[in-house]
C-alpha cells in the first residue's frame, strides 16, 4: 500500500475496552497525527446480552428483573418504560398515589444517575476530589431506595398498574430531609467546579453541537437541550403526573461540554423541586391497580383448601398483550428511552425493540473528536454520558 508522506506519520491507538475513561467496555480505534485526532471508530457489542430476544420469551412480570440491567445506574426508568408500554397497550389506569410514588422514584433515580455521571466526568478531566463528594450524596439516595424497595440497585419495584409496595412509615420525612440537604450539596458543587478556571479551560468550546445538527443526529436529553432545543418528554408527552408540578425545562444554547454539564447540574435542582412538591401533595389510596391482574380462573379454590389458605400458592399474574403495536417513551437521565412493542394476544410480546438514548447519542462521537486533541476525547465522551449496558443491550 502506497502511503503519502503525511499518512506515514499517522499512529493508530486502541482506547479501551478496559480504559477507565471509557465508562464500560467501549473500544475506540483512534487515528492520531501527533496529538491531533484524525479519525475515531467506536467498536460496540462487548456487553451485548440479547435483551430484546429475552423479552420476547418472557411475560412482562418475568422480564422486569432483566430490564434493570440495561442502564444499571438509572434502573427506575428502565422499569417504568417496561410497565408503561403494556399499560398504554391495555388501557390500564394507574392509581394517583402510585403515580406520585413513581415520579418521586424516577426523579431520585435521575439525581443518582447525574451524580454518578458528574464524579467520573470530573475524574476524567483531572479533578479527583468531587468524585468522593458525589458518593456522599449518592449513598443517601440509595438508602432511600433500600428503605422503599429492599434493594440499593436493581430495584424491581414497578409493576403493571402501580408499584410493588407502598412507602414505609417515615420515608416521606426522610426524603424531605434529603432534599433540603442535597440543595446545599449542589451549591457546593457550583462553588467547587463551575467557577474553577482549570475546569473551564478543559470544557469550554469542546465538542460543540449546533441545534439543527443535534436534531439531525437524533440526539435527546441533556445532549439536545444543551444545544438550545427546549425539548423534554415530561412536558411534551404529559406522562405520569408531571403536569401537576411546577418546574422548568433546563437548557443552554452553547452546545459544548460546559453547556451539557450546566444542564445536568440544573436538572438535579429541578428534580428536587419536583420531589418536594410530590412529597407534600401525595394522596392516599391504593398503590397498585389489582383489577388488572388476570388470574387463572379455571381452578376456583375452595375456602378451606390448601391453595386458598396459602396465598403464596396463587397462580402467577399474567397479562395478555392486545394485538396492537405501540411506541412508548420517557425522559431518562441520558435522553429519550423508548420501546416499540407489538402484542399478539399472548403473555409474551411478539416484538420488543429498545430505543436506548446512550446508543443514539454515541453516534456523534467520531464527528465531535475529529481535529481535536487526544486528551479532549475523554472530555467529550464523558460529557455524552453513556452506559454500555444500554448501548449494547
Swiss-Prot record:
Which GO terms fall under biological process for this protein?
photosynthesis, light reaction
Q: What quaternary arrangement does the UniProt entry report?
A: NDH is composed of at least 16 different subunits, 5 of which are encoded in the nucleus.
- This protein is called NAD(P)H-quinone oxidoreductase subunit H, chloroplastic
Member of which family?
Belongs to the complex I 49 kDa subunit family.
Instruction: Identify one Pfam family in the record.
Output: Complex1_49kDa
GO CC, sorted alphabetically, is: chloroplast thylakoid membrane
Its function? Answer: NDH shuttles electrons from NAD(P)H:plastoquinone, via FMN and iron-sulfur (Fe-S) centers, to quinones in the photosynthetic chain and possibly in a chloroplast respiratory chain. The immediate electron acceptor for the enzyme in this species is believed to be plastoquinone. Couples the redox reaction to proton translocation, and thus conserves the redox energy in a proton gradient.
Membrane topology, as annotated, equals: Peripheral membrane protein
Q: Tell where it localizes.
A: Plastid, Chloroplast thylakoid membrane
Q: Which reaction does it catalyse?
A: a plastoquinone + NADH + (n+1) H(+)(in) = a plastoquinol + NAD(+) + n H(+)(out); a plastoquinone + NADPH + (n+1) H(+)(in) = a plastoquinol + NADP(+) + n H(+)(out)
Q: Which terms in the Gene Ontology molecular function aspect does this entry carry? A: NAD binding; oxidoreductase activity, acting on NAD(P)H, quinone or similar compound as acceptor; quinone binding
What EC number(s) does the entry state? 7.1.1.-
Tell me which UniProt keywords the record has, alphabetically.
Chloroplast, Membrane, NAD, NADP, Plastid, Plastoquinone, Quinone, Thylakoid, Translocase, Transport
